[in-house]
Each structure stands twice: as structure tokens, then as C-alpha cells.
């Protein structure tokens, strides 16, 4: 997709919110606002999708097999999930979680962020959503947080979730439940093999929208910015007429 001027400013954080475990990223030296690595999706195809609204009042959980939509574009495998989030509430923290299915399979998410005109603004590949070990209140999962600061005039942002042919060739090594239990109670960790989850086009994905930035750490230079402030994508002139998603 040919890069147009975007109207979204991005603040990026390498950590999660205080309420969830810290994430170790596989590769933090990438620039999310560089969307050239993302699949090229025609605007007309994006306009055919039904964008499910998600706000900070309640997380949205969707299953690819039942809630996914077809998007026949090179570089995208299987169905996609399409969400819209409010862009007029200040800085947004989007927590994306992909649950591991019975320790055998998992959906490896990629996320393309689009501004209110459906112009690509940021791309978060699957490496941005690393494996998280199970905890007291959480199961095995792939998870990451995307921190976005929409430019003035934005009303909505669009979140496209998909996987790729390359991701389907990979697997994720999990933590064996016996090891997790031993680790949790402080016992010696048994020397047993860990299960391996294959990557599939199906899975359960949860998207949470938050405006709580008390624990955020701005790390612009880590992602290729030359300053500590928010990374601005495109210009912040008055926006053109926004795309109106179908009701």
C-alpha cells in the first residue's frame, strides 16, 4: 500500500501496564511507523470490512473461526479481525492477547494500525507479541501493548489483526505446566521437555483499550526516534473527511 500522509502521533512503550507481567520483546529495534513491511491492503478492501468498536469500558474477545472476516490479500493467511477504537480520549494503550489453545496451537498476531481515513500509521509484527508464561490469573498467551497518541482531530483508529504465511511456518515453545507449578511454589524445576504450540489461522484474541498512562515509559529512541517525545507520523494538519465505517 502506498504510504500516504498519516494523522496519527504515536507514543510507544516497551513495558506493559503495571497490572500485567513485564514483556521481553524478541526485537525492539524496529520502527512501528514504518509500514512498508506490512502487507499491502487496498483501501477498497478495508472499506468492505466490518469494524467492531471497542472502548475502555470492556475488553473485546473474538475467535478467528467464528468472528474473523476474509481478506484475500497477499501476505495475509486466513481470516482477519477488524476493530475500531476511539481516538479522542488522549493516549491509548492497546493490549492484545492471543490465547494458547490446549498447549497445542496459537494464533500469532500481526497488527496494522490505520488512522481515521484508513491510512496505514503503524505496523506491529508478530515478534512484538512474545510468549507470556501462565500466572495466577492468566494462561499461556502471546501478548503485547501498543501505545498510541492520536493527533488532534482524529475520532477513530482502526486495528487490523492478522497472521502471515511466514508465521504459520513457526512455532512457540511453552512452559510445561509442571515447571510452572514448581516455579510458582518455589520448588526445584523438573528437567522435562516443554510443549510446542504450532501457529495456526484460528485462535482466540482479546483486545483491551486503556487510557491509564501512570506507569508508561516513553522510549522513542529505542524504536528509532531521535528524541524522548512522542513519535509523530505524517503531519498534524487539519484532517480530511474521515472514513465512516458501516453501522
Locate each region found by the language model.
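Noncatalytic modules at the cell exterior or secretory-pathway interfaces
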Residues: 89-94, 147-173
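Gram-negative bacterial Sec-dependent N-terminal signal peptides
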Residues: 1-25
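Activation corresponds to long, low-complexity, non-globular regions
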Residues: 24-51, 172-247
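Solvent-exposed beta-hairpin/edge-strand motifs
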Residues: 110-116
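Solvent-exposed serine/threonine-rich low-complexity stretches and specific carbohydrate-binding patches
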Residues: 122-134
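Non-catalytic, beta-strand-enriched accessory regions in extracellular/secretory proteins
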Residues: 65-88, 141-143
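Short coil-to-beta strand junction motifs in C2/discoidin
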Residues: 103-110
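Exposed aromatic-hydrophobic patches
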Residues: 81-84, 117, 122, 136-149
Amino acid at each position: 500500500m502506498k504510504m500516504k500522509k498519516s494523522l496519527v502521533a504515536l507514543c510507544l512503550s516497551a513495558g506493559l501496564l503495571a497490572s500485567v507481567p513485564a514483556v521481553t520483546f524478541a526485537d525492539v529495534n524496529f520502527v512501528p511507523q514504518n509500514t512498508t513491511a506490512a502487507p499491502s491492503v487496498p483501501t477498497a478492501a478495508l472499506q468492505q470490512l466490518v469494524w467492531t468498536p471497542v472502548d475502555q469500558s470492556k475488553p473485546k474477545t473474538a475467535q478467528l473461526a467464528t468472528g474473523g472476516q476474509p481478506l484475500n490479500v497477499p501476505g495475509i493467511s486466513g481470516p482477519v479481525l477488524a476493530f475500531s477504537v476511539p481516538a479522542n480520549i488522549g493516549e491509548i494503550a492497546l493490549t492484545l492477547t492471543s490465547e494458547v489453545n490446549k498447549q497445542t496451537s496459537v494464533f500469532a498476531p500481526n497488527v496494522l494500525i490505520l488512522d481515521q481515513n484508513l491510512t496505514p500509521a503503524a505496523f506491529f509484527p508478530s515478534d512484538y507479541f512474545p510468549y507470556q508464561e501462565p500466572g495466577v490469573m492468566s494462561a499461556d498467551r502471546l501478548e503485547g501493548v501498543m501505545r498510541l497518541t492520536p493527533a488532534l482531530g482524529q475520532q477513530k483508529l482502526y486495528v487490523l489483526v492478522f497472521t502471515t504465511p511466514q508465521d504459520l511456518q513457526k512455532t512457540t515453545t511453552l512452559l510445561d505446566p509442571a515447571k510452572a507449578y514448581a516455579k510458582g511454589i518455589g520448588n526445584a524445576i523438573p528437567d522435562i521437555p516443554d510443549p510446542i504450540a504450532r501457529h495456526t489461522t484460528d485462535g482466540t484474541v482479546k483486545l483491551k483499550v486503556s487510557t491509564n498512562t501512570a506507569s508508561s515509559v516513553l522510549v522513542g529512541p529505542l524504536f528509532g526516534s531521535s528524541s524522548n517525545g512522542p513519535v509523530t507520523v505524517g503531519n498534524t494538519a487539519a484532517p480530511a473527511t474521515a472514513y465512516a465505517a458501516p453501522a
